Structures are given as C-alpha cells and as structure tokens.
C-alpha cells in the first residue's frame, strides 16, 4: 500500500472511532474493534510505526475484552512489526510467535502465511538468511495451498531478493 493511499484510508477511518454507540442493526456501522483492525492492518502493510503504536495496543485491548481471537492475533502480529521497526527484536519475536500460535490454532492459513512472512522479515533484521528462507518458504506453501496468488507472488519476490 502506497503512503498516500494509507493516508487517505486513515483519514476516512479515524473519524469513525469518534462515533458513539454500537450499530442499531448488525452490519450497519463498523464496531470500534473493526475500525482499529483495519487501521492496524493498513499500518502494518505501510510499515507505519507511529500508527501501529497508537492502534495496535487498542486493538489488543478490544480483542481481549471481546474474546476475539482473530483480532488478537492481528494485534500480536502488528505489535511484532512495531517492535521490529523499533529494533526491539526479542519483543518482536515473542509477539509474532503469539500471533502464529493463535492463527495455527484457528487453522487460519492466510493469517499463518502473513505471520510467517513477518517472521522472515524479522530473520532478515537479524541477518539470519537461512531462517528467513525457511519462513518465506513456509509462507509461500501456505499461500499456494489457499490459492492466494497475490501473496504468493509477493513472497516469491521476497525469496528471489535474498537468493
């Protein structure tokens, strides 16, 4: 996601967090945790440390409150990325492993693949090319098993860049 696209998305979503109340009917308005999740996912893709620092802890809080395991996994992954961007590699690994465990337990293959990609990025930050190849390879397998062509292609490109 380009920085300009992320800025537009953020401009559109942040005001929704100021709205009070819950939807009158299911599906008529995004819940706070849904808006936070969208901001966190976009910030993760944009590698925006400031937005991750602002919304990932909130998403984690809301996911724990609501017992929403998919959003909790997304929050852990986002916090892992934020820690990696800040150079806090041990904290990043802990968060990414928490996310991976949650997603594997839910058999959420696409989320598993995305988390494995982030673990590969962490490996690269540690200059551990062999581990990165392993994580990218497992991510590629997950994406191919699902037919997630765009993610599989991005992963192939990442693999080619380090071969």
Residue ranges and their predicted role:
Residues 1-163:
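Helix-coil-helix junctions within alpha-helical repeat/solenoid scaffolds
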């Amino acid at each position: 996601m380009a920085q300009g696209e992320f800025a537009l998305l953020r401009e559109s979503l942040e005001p929704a967090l100021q709205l009070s109340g819950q939807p009158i009917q299911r599906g008529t308005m995004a819940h706070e945790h849904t808006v936070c999740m969208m901001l966190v996912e976009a910030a993760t893709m944009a590698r925006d440390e400031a937005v991750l620092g602002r919304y990932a802890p909130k998403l984690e809080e809301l996911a724990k409150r609501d017992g929403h395991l998919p959003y909790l996994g997304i929050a852990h992954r986002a916090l892992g990325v934020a820690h990696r961007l800040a150079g806090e590699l041990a904290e990043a690994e802990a968060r990414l492993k928490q996310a991976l465990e949650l997603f594997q337990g839910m058999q959420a293959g696409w989320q598993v693949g995305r988390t494995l990609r982030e673990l590969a990025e962490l490996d690269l930050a540690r200059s551990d090319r062999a581990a990165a190849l392993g994580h990218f390879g497992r991510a590629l397998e997950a994406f191919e098993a699902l037919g997630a062509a765009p993610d599989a292609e991005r992963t192939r490109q990442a693999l080619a860049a380090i071969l």
